[in-house]
Amino acid sequence: SEVTAVSVLTRPALKKKSAIPHRIFANLALLDGKYLASAPRHVLANTTMDAFAHLAESYINTKATPYSRMCVAAGLREWARSKDVVLGKREATAEACVTMLRAACFGGMSIAQTGTSLPHGLSYAVTVHTRMAHGKACGFFLRNYLAEADPVDRDAVLSLAGFADVDDFEAYYRATCGRDAVPDAVLALAVQDLMTNPAKMALAPFAVDETVLRRIAGIGEAG
């Protein structure tokens, strides 16, 4: 997302992907809808799913504040406006492209305050070992992350994004990104990697242990 001070470095030789925060912050974010005008629908699906993950993980976060949640709420309202474009139900007009970028911008403003949480932390191993696109990999874990959250927080996120419940979100994820099968061995590796990062685990506002992480990862679930 725009307006964050974080870069992500992938090192294939080491099978590692991690975030690198810098003590810099952009003065300007260029939100020009023309950047998205020729993007294939699968690219829009994956990148807008990443933006949703930023927003949801910032809201359901131990570092969330009334101010960060104001950014999340604004971003989710913008994000919801472009769902039909990603679903292929209407064209990606210039206005729709700007709306998608604006949602991404609010996502960046949100995680700049809170950081991302467990879905992002679990996604890195999946991206490295299966080459799944980043946004799609984050979305892979979102349904179960939302299911673990406090019902009030979960319902706030889903309602703002225009979803009735976690299954409604999951149906959208499958329709746009598709749910690929990920080997349990890779998911178990994602869990073990995340357990070495207590700072990331601490950002989930509920008790987290290996059992919870395996549940969020969906280990043992049929596709």
Residues covered by each model-derived region:
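Active-site pocket-lining segment
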Residues: 125-181
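C-terminal charged capping/lid subdomain of soluble metabolic enzymes
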Residues: 23, 158, 162-223
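Carboxylate- and glycine-rich phosphate/diphosphate-binding segment that chelates Mg2+/Mn2+
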Residues: 6-114
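Short glycine/serine/threonine-rich phosphate/pyrophosphate-binding segments
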Residues: 1-3, 119
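Amphipathic alpha-helical interaction segments
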Residues: 70-74, 95, 99-102, 121-124, ...
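Glycine-rich flexible loops
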Residues: 2, 53, 77, 101, ...
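Glycine-rich phosphate/pyrophosphate-binding beta-alpha loops
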Residues: 108-133
